[in-house]
């Protein structure tokens, strides 16, 4: 038989609707200090916790000069493109989970990219600060890994450029 929602369970306010992201407009200028060249599509914002999920797309040859800090947990899955950041280069399939108040960036992309982001712990806000090191293309790998994955550390074999 087909699936149906449980009757009388849950909170209708928190219902997640099916969205056609191809029909959704990108929003820009979502922070006055955010570098130009990116757009966001909000997929869901929990009305009770303000936890948010969204897509972020950026143009090719875009980079930032400052680091960011958020008061909430931030989670990301890279859907397409590549990202050069303060801890190395991420490619499609890259994932991170970052605790609140951890400075990160600056970031850049040669190809442009599409991310899926999610926050936990309330409403997202961003504070910009000077980066601990300046942005550069092809930074050294400096990934933070849980101890059980340390043996996997090292360069990914294959081509450096797309």
Segments (PLM) and residue ranges:
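Ligand-binding loop in jelly-roll beta-barrel domains
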Residues: 89-90, 100-131
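Alpha/beta-hydrolase fold active-site loops
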Residues: 73
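Generic preference for hydrophobic/aromatic residues in regular secondary structure cores
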Residues: 53, 107, 114-115, 159-161
